[in-house]
């Protein structure tokens, strides 16, 4: 039976999400995937769809609403992939008890304000041109595996090179068998 993968979109959701089809194309044959549009989880009703207005709506209660709705919709342990705001939503839901096997975030800059980490393996990717990414010390303090990509900004998750890397990482994480321990006889 395939592992479950829950994908939580960036703040744009399906409205600017053609890139998500590349992830689905790579991953759907290996995972049982559920996709959540962050705007729908947050019940956003923004009159003018600018980045600034959508961002403000998430910060002013939308993230909390999205966390509550994600927790109602997902109750079984699963792997999570979150893009930008979606990674923050998944992170906060895990801290509130959402069962999570692993969390893979890409460009989730709001995590820089978090002081506690979910109790699961975490991978966080950021572009080195993303000025709002967490500082290096944050990753060390929370013991988080991270990678920084040269020449990429916040929307790096829409780039085919990054899409391929993320998908390969996720596939490796669920297809690699644990290494066997060799017992040594002591005389």
Give, region by region, the residue ranges found by the protein language model:
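Short beta-strand/loop motif that positions the catalytic acidic residue
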Residues: 124-126
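Short, conserved loop/helix-junction motifs that constitute active-site signature segments
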Residues: 97-98, 112-120, 139-142
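Conserved loop-alpha-helix segment in the C-terminal half of the alpha/beta-hydrolase fold
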Residues: 133-145
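Serine-hydrolase catalytic machinery in alpha/beta-hydrolase-like enzymes
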Residues: 2-73
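Gly/Ala-rich beta-loop-alpha elbow adjacent to hydrolase catalytic centers
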Residues: 81-90
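Catalytic histidine-centered segment of alpha/beta-hydrolase-like enzymes
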Residues: 151-161
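Hydrolases whose catalytic domains are alpha/beta-hydrolase-1, hotdog thioesterase
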Residues: 89-93, 114
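A conserved short beta-strand
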Residues: 98-110
């Amino acid at each position: 039976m395939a592992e479950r993968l829950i994908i939580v979109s960036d703040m744009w959701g399906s409205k600017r999400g053609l890139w998500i089809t590349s992830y689905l194309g790579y991953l759907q044959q290996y995972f049982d995937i559920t996709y959540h549009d962050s705007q729908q989880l947050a019940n956003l009703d923004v009159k003018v769809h600018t980045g600034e207005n959508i961002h403000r709506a998430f910060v002013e209660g939308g993230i909390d609403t999205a966390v509550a709705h994600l927790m109602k919709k997902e109750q079984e342990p699963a792997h999570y992939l979150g893009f930008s705001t979606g990674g923050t939503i998944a992170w906060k839901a895990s801290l509130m008890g959402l069962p999570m096997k692993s969390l893979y975030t890409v460009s989730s800059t709001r995590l820089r304000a978090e002081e506690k980490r979910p109790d699961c393996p975490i991978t966080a990717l950021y572009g080195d041109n993303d000025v709002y990414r967490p500082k290096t010390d944050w990753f060390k303090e929370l013991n988080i595996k991270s990678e920084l990509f040269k020449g990429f900004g916040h929307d790096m998750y829409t780039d085919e090179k990054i899409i391929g890397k993320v998908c390969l990482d996720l596939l490796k994480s669920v297809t690699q068998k644990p290494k066997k321990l060799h017992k040594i006889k002591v005389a």
